[in-house]
Amino acid sequence: MRIVLTLSLLLFGVAFMPQPAAASLEGAWRGSGIVSYRGGADKVRCRVHFSRVGAKAFGVSSDCATETGRYATTGRVVPSGANRYFGLIQGEGVTGKVVIVQHGKRLYVSVSSRRGSAKLSLSR
């Protein structure tokens, strides 16, 4: 259950990172944060990759690790305002919502699912 929650949270976090320009989201990012779930929380480290899949949309894939395991998620995000993205991610049978906000060379990601939430800070 922690694995599914962690993956969902990570994917959502990645999806909600805003960028000044859509093209700047493309590429590899890495960082850390906290995954919260019923009964506790874990520190998490992630590597996230964004690739363009349309005029404005980006595919998202992430590989994250906690003390209890490694998790992978995939999804898609689209612009939802200035330096903001929104999308859905999936992993370990769980789907989550992601909001990404960009401030310079840093992405702030929030992920939420029925199993928990996550907050991440990513950089290039």
Pin down the residues of each PLM region.
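Central antiparallel beta-sheet cores of small beta-barrel/beta-sandwich binding domains
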Residues: 23-124
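Positively charged n-region of N-terminal signal peptides that target proteins for export
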Residues: 1-4
